[in-house]
Amino acid sequence: MSGPSPHQPSPWQPDLLALIPSPSPARASAAPADQQPDLPAAAPSAPAQAAPGPRRAPATLLILDTETTGLDPARGRCIEVGAILFAVAERAVLAQVSFLLPTDANPAEHVNGIAAAVTRLPQPWQAGLRFFVAMLEAAEAVLAHNAAFDRQWFGIDPLPPVRKPWICSMDDIRWPAHLCLKTSPSVRDLALAHGVPVWAAHRALSDCTYLAQVLERCTDLDTLLVAALEPRQLFRARLSYAERQKARDAGFRWNDPVPGAWTRRLTEAEAGALPFPVERVEPQAGGVTQTTAACGAAAA
């Protein structure tokens, strides 16, 4: 995907930031650039409830994306967050925000085009983070492309934990067959398949904008979201090397996340409908995996 293009500030941004309370005089004095803002206290965990009724689509989604200095949170850090609050029934964007987080170095500059020096320029990232938290509280679910990657950065200072349900637009949503998409499409391919022009990539808010435009064009969005929220587990294909194409055609990935295996996250119904046997994979401590009973057409 092509590198980022310069973005002009949106006219709404001053109005949104004007909604953020001004810091008290005590805090206004010489606060370091990387000082963490005061965030709302996390809501207490909800008590256990009886069996839920029929699922419904979330009324609001927080579409989010991150840009980072690497792939591993233990070695890298998040340097940009973009987010859009989206009303599902109305197919409407309610609010949006994007901000950079200061960093000393960015080894992934060749990917996201964000120079470390730019992240350290004066800008109200603390206010942006507070507004992001408010948007998160207003959403019923979070949607991200490759959510497994994005979610691992939240809960690491200064980003808050995310306790809302996650939906992955790459792996959890079963896009209609007539779009002729790969099993795990890229943001670019997903946008183009829905007639959304692509002008930039690898900046957080631009990728969120593409996803919002895709959702606006979905006539059966509620159905797609309800299905995407079904519980999923990781399954490993039980196929010989000669049969590996069957796994590839069914959207399984080789060596990711289980080394030396074809795996994919599926619902129980999806796993049972496969034309080849699969087994559940349970992550264990120390990176070891444990498999359980097989299912699929050939498992009986």
List each language-model region with its residue ranges.
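Acidic two-metal-ion nuclease catalytic site recognized across multiple nuclease folds
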Residues: S2-G53, V214-A300
